[in-house]
């Protein structure tokens, strides 16, 4: 495949056209008066959304050089979404502003490496200052405000705040599509882990493709079960009780799996097998968690327990277990509350000691599963198109709220970025480095300017006034008033604002230091297929 190469100014200009096309499509959604974007779907109804990352991912441009520029900015939105779960439109607006300003200076002869240093310096100062002005989130009301701003819907804010109150900040909150018009909250007390049934023949509800076990016994082991003789004694005891059985094991295969499936199909008894969650030592810990929650024991040779000699007393109990293709939820485990409390305290102690980010995340998950439960927000709407749009909004709001709980909140509506303006402006830098700082200064005005423009106002007027206002005072584009943003409940999670700025700067710096771009040369279309006979006379 032949390649086409463009250099320096020509390359950057072509990529900038792509950046502008993508960013212009995304930034119309910013702020309380932002509009929606309609995305064509090959199948089904079009998707209407105001979610930056969803729009960015859909955009493919014909010109390969423009497309590369667009893809770079889509990466900003995508990375911000991965880290903070929201703020993707802000990140796109910041990236476009930095790239545009930077390109002007590079064209005028500035050194891209010097500019890059300046950008990095300015962003580091801005991030430190954002952390300094960040306020911790307190109470249900603050949580509701963050969620309501993100979803542009107060009702959603209340729902998410209630969900977090019910299952705790550590709890698991999932989204489902409701059959009706209303959006409601359903709290499932219980533990969920990401392992589904070993065989689809084990399902009890063919419509939902899930296995629902009422009052089951739960066998928990770290062994691989392939020989039916290993579990025959315990199966016989469970069958006598007339209750279903959930088997959590390293794996269930071969003869053992075949026997369980055949008996399920014949209606002799119901047993569902799932693989144990996690790996290595983490798996042992999670199995122990499940055992404590359900009042059972982990059948492990390390602990001197053998499958063949297991009695019904070693099995856990729960009022209900739901197993889907991907997840298992244990509801209302019959474990001793004192033992569960002790286990929770043990995990909390480990959380305080750990230095690894990954371990912390996994311990948080385990804590959530033991301490809280699972809250399900059932999203309802009149049409499928509205349902998809609403679901995306609520997903963003949920991520936003979690980010706020983690790192606190700052004034919303782009005000927080303007509040760090003076600190960034005070950076001592010379030459091209100073130019890099100025680029960031110009970029951090952009979200406020865009929010005002989307509300039909002159952005520059709002930006200039904001520079003279006290910190925390900002422009409420929804009402057209100047207010104390945090008091008015217009807040953004610090993590979202920080991630948007850092990711935008990272991609802008890469963009400005680009000197050559290589793309596939489009193939010449030679017209119709050769050798096709004349179709004359065919009806």
From Swiss-Prot:
- Could you tell me the Gene Ontology terms of the biological process aspect for this record? protein refolding
Indicate which residues the UniProt annotation says bind ATP: 29-32, 86-90, 413, 476-478, 492
Indicate the secretion signal residues: none
Reactions catalysed according to its record: ATP + H2O + a folded polypeptide = ADP + phosphate + an unfolded polypeptide
Q: Keyword set for this entry? A: ATP-binding, Chaperone, Cytoplasm, Isomerase, Nucleotide-binding
Q: What is its main location?
A: cytoplasm
Answer whether the UniProt record assigns the keyword Isomerase to this protein.
Answer: yes
Q: Which InterPro entries match?
A: Chaperonin_Cpn60_CS (IPR018370), Cpn60/GroEL (IPR001844), Cpn60/GroEL/TCP-1 (IPR002423), GroEL-like_apical_dom_sf (IPR027409), GROEL-like_equatorial_sf (IPR027413), TCP-1-like_intermed_sf (IPR027410)
Where can this protein be found?
Cytoplasm
Q: Which Gene3D superfamilies match?
A: GroEL, GroEL-like equatorial domain, TCP-1-like chaperonin intermediate domain
> What EC number(s) would the UniProt record show?
5.6.1.7
Q: Which GO terms describe its cellular component?
A: cytoplasm
Q: Does the keyword Cytoplasm apply?
A: yes
* Molecular-function GO terms, alphabetical: ATP binding; ATP-dependent protein folding chaperone; isomerase activity; unfolded protein binding
**What PANTHER family is this protein classified in?**
60 KDA HEAT SHOCK PROTEIN, MITOCHONDRIAL
Q: How does it assemble?
A: Forms a cylinder of 14 subunits composed of two heptameric rings stacked back-to-back. Interacts with the co-chaperonin GroES.
Q: To which protein family does this belong?
A: Belongs to the chaperonin (HSP60) family.
What this chain does, per the entry, is described as:
Together with its co-chaperonin GroES, plays an essential role in assisting protein folding. The GroEL-GroES system forms a nano-cage that allows encapsulation of the non-native substrate proteins and provides a physical environment optimized to promote and accelerate protein folding.
Q: What is this protein called?
A: Chaperonin GroEL
């Amino acid at each position: 495949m032949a390649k086409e190469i463009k250099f320096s100014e020509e390359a950057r200009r072509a990529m900038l056209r792509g950046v502008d096309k993508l960013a212009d499509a995304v930034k119309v959604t910013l702020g309380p008066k932002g509009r929606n974007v309609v995305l064509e779907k090959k199948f089904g109804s079009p998707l209407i959304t105001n979610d930056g990352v969803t729009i960015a991912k859909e955009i493919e441009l014909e010109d390969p050089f423009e497309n590369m520029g667009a893809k770079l900015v889509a990466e900003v939105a995508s990375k911000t979404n991965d880290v903070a779960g929201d703020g993707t439109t802000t990140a796109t607006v910041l990236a476009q502003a930095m790239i545009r300003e930077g390109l002007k200076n590079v064209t005028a002869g500035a050194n891209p490496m010097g500019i890059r240093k300046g950008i990095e310096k300015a962003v580091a100062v801005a991030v430190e200052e954002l952390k300094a002005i960040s306020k911790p989130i307190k109470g249900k009301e603050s949580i509701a405000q963050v969620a309501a701003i993100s979803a542009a819907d107060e009702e959603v804010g209340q729902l998410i705040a209630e969900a977090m109150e019910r299952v705790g900040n550590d709890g698991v909150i999932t989204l489902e599509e409701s059959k009706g018009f209303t959006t409601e909250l359903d709290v499932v007390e219980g533990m969920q882990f990401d392992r589904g049934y070993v065989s689809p023949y084990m399902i009890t509800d063919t419509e939902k493709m899930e296995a629902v076990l009422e009052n089951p016994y739960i066998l928990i082991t770290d062994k691989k079960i392939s020989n039916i003789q290993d579990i025959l004694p315990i199966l016989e005891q469970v069958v006598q009780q007339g209750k279903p059985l959930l088997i959590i094991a390293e794996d269930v295969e071969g003869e053992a799996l075949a026997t369980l499936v055949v008996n399920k199909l014949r209606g002799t008894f119901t047993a569902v097998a799932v693989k144990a969650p996690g790996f290595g030592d983490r798996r042992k810990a999670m199995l122990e968690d499940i055992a404590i929650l359900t009042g059972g024991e982990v059948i492990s040779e390390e602990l001197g327990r053998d499958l063949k000699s297991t009695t019904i007393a070693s099995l856990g109990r729960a009022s209900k277990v739901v197993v889907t293709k991907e997840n298992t939820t244990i509801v209302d485990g019959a474990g001793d509350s004192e033992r569960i409390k002790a286990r929770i305290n043990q995990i909390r102690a480990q959380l305080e000691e750990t230095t690894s980010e990954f371990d912390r995340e996994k311990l948080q998950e385990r804590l959530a599963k033991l301490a809280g439960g699972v809250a399900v927000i059932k999203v309802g709407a009149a049409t499928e198109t509205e349902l998809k749009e609403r679901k995306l909004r609520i997903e963003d709001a949920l991520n936003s709220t979690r980010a706020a709980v983690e790192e606190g909140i700052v004034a919303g509506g782009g005000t927080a970025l303007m509040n760090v303006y003076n600190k960034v402006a005070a950076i001592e830098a010379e030459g091209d480095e100073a130019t890099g700082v100025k680029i960031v200064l110009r970029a951090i005005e952009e979200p406020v300017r865009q929010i005002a423009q989307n509300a039909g106002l002159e952005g520059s007027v709002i930006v200039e006034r904001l520079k003279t206002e006290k910190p925390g005072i900002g422009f409420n584009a929804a009402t057209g008033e100047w207010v104390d943003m945090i008091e008015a409940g217009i807040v953004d999670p610090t993590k979202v604002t920080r991630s948007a700025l850092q990711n935008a700067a990272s991609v802008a710096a890469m963009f400005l230091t680009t000197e050559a771009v290589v793309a596939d040369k489009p193939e010449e279309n030679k017209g119709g297929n050769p050798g096709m006979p004349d179709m004359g006379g065919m009806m």
